[in-house]
Amino acid sequence: QQLITFVSQSVLDFLPEDVKVSQELQYTLIKDDYYKGTGNQVLAMNNGKVIDVKKQQVTILDENGTEITFSKLKDIQVKKFQKIKQGDTIALYQQKFKMIFEYLGKQITYQEYLGM
């Protein structure tokens, strides 16, 4: 967990300290950690940086230090270490996609994330 915190803080050094988090983009919980949006695009909810990209999965470290892992994706449109802005397209999905939120090494819910 110390390594994750160190890496998270190192990656976030490029971001300004006093940034207001906007929660304009929201998704609907289907079941468990599966969500859907209004279209077929997964959009970044906040500014941040892509810290991992796999076959159907992207992990983003956002400006408040939360790691968001999106999975069950199609046509990933970001690359590892790419800076992203709120509203940028991360990937596409078909019927649903999975989102996992982790803050300071602890998994949090989507609702907790929105309240940050």
Where are these regions (language model features)?
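Conserved, short, structured surface segments that act as functional micro-motifs
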Residues: 80-116
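Surface-exposed, glycine-biased beta-strand/turn segments
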Residues: 1-57, 61, 85-86
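Zn2+-dependent peptidoglycan hydrolase active-site motif and core
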Residues: 44-77, 97, 101
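Small beta-barrel nucleic-acid-binding modules, principally OB-folds
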Residues: 26-36, 66-69, 97-98, 102-105, ...
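Intrinsically disordered, low-complexity regions
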Residues: 38-40, 49, 66, 106, ...
